[in-house]
């Protein structure tokens, strides 16, 4: 949660109000402070100030260009930002990277942006590293990630014969950055941050944990497999795809990547617990995406079950990519809010509808020892009619049935419902406060709580 932003906006918050009859008089269009903008979920356009990085040839550093763009809600934000970046600078004195690039795809998962470019340009190592740094800096500043993994023509970026691995944000001049890279590349042991992919607790999605790995020679596959077998280091809610008693040796039954990009896994029973074909694919997806960020030439992985061979490609592996969202649910004693990370399919995070649907689903089974459902017992996501952004206010429109159910809640239940919604939606950096509406209209009060104005997050309720 972005504490500094919450501290600033908390000065403007209006939390509680005295008791008075409900009055459904204020149509939302009468709120002059809520200029219609666009919707994170349903609207068409959203004004956005993008921070784009280009080369300053005078200083040989990366410099920013702030550019006002209109984001189309139906197109992923990352795609639009990087297409703007690749279109070249508009400010004088900045240098772009050429026009022969096509942005193929961007996946955002677990704080990592996987950026895929197609190009026919034959870049020098120094120019490629500068482009990678510009892409990574742009991703960190605009997409809420900590790292970027860069791919050119479906291959992970290699410079000086070594994989770049994950890049964070750099403020070095490009000459020093390149020289530092070459010095490290000349050492016998090559250490880089790598995204290792594990299963989430539900075992429905895969998520990365970033870890610095050291490679000797080209033992990329073996070292990644060994690290996966150790399990996550700090994301303890993730699960290793490998058997806990897996004994790795460098002479493991692993095979090698063929000329057609096929990696054949021979000893499946020594790697994974026996499961359904789909579970095996999910486990293989962990391996595929972990290898894919470092190893060149990988196009598919094959495993055999019984007499049948099964293939996992990039497009299959991509289906299992997840993304974390932070949700708030009432505590069992109804005295505070409990925080939980849920995993949704990559691309569904930072969407008002997704947050509300997850709240309506309630806490997971393993969370129910600490938390209660947020929504009334007789109401699910059907109680949400819509949600949109107006300036930095999330306007959530509930049904009349939801209003009726909320009116039947006890005071502490209602209080925690309101702030479970507010705190959850305000986890998105674009949302500062939440305006509650019912059938398109603002009501003055619900119980003893004022809803005439937007509610700001309550940090003190969260534990």
Task: Tell me the role of every PLM-derived stretch.
Residues 1-5:
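Positively charged n-region of N-terminal signal peptides that target proteins for export
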């Amino acid at each position: 949660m972005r504490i500094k932003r919450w501290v600033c906006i908390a000065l403007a918050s209006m939390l509680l109000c005295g008791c008075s009859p409900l009055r459904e008089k204020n149509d939302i269009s009468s709120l002059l402070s809520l200029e219609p903008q666009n919707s994170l979920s349903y609207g068409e356009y959203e004004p956005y100030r993008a921070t784009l990085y280009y080369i300053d040839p005078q200083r040989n550093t990366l410099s920013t260009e702030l550019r006002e763009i209109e984001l189309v809600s139906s197109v992923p934000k990352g795609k639009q930002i990087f297409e703007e970046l690749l279109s070249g600078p508009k400010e004088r004195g900045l240098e772009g990277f050429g026009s022969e690039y096509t942005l193929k795809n961007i996946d955002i998962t677990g704080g990592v942006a996987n950026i895929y470019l197609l190009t026919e340009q034959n870049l020098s190592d120094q120019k490629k590293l500068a482009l990678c740094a510009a892409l990574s800096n742009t991703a960190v500043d605009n997409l809420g990630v900590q790292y970027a993994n860069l791919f050119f023509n479906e291959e992970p970026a290699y410079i000086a014969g070594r994989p770049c691995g994950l890049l964070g944000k750099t403020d070095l001049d490009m000459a020093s950055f390149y020289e530092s890279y070459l010095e490290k590349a000349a050492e016998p042991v090559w250490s880089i941050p790598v995204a290792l992919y594990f299963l989430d607790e539900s075992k429905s999605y895969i998520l990365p944990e970033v870890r610095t790995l050291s490679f000797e020679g080209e033992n990329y596959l073996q070292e990644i497999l060994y690290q996966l077998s150790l399990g996550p280091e700090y994301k303890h809610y993730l699960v290793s795809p490998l058997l806990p008693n897996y004994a790795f040796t460098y002479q493991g039954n692993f095979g090698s990547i063929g000329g057609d990009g096929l990696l054949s896994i021979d000893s499946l029973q020594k790697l994974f617990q026996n499961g359904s074909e789909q579970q095996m694919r999910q486990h293989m997806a962990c391996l595929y995406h972990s290898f894919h960020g470092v190893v060149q030439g990988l196009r598919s992985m094959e495993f055999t079950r019984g007499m049948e061979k099964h293939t996992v490609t990039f497009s299959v592996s991509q289906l299992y990519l997840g993304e974390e969202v932070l949700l708030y649910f009432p505590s069992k004693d109804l005295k505070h809010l409990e925080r939980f990370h849920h995993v949704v399919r990559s691309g569904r995070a930072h969407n008002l509808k997704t947050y509300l649907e997850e709240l309506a689903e309630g806490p997971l089974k393993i969370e129910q020892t600490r938390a209660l459902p947020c929504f009334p017992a007789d109401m699910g996501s059907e109680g949400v009619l819509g949600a949109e952004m107006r300036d930095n206010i999330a306007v959530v429109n509930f049904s009349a049935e939801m209003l009726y159910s909320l009116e039947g809640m006890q005071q502490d239940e209602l209080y925690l419902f309101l702030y479970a919604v507010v705190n959850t939606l305000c986890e998105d950096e674009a949302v500062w406060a939440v305006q509650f509406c019912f059938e398109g209209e603002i009501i003055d009060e619900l119980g003893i709580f004022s809803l005439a104005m937007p509610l700001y997050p309550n940090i003190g309720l969260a534990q």
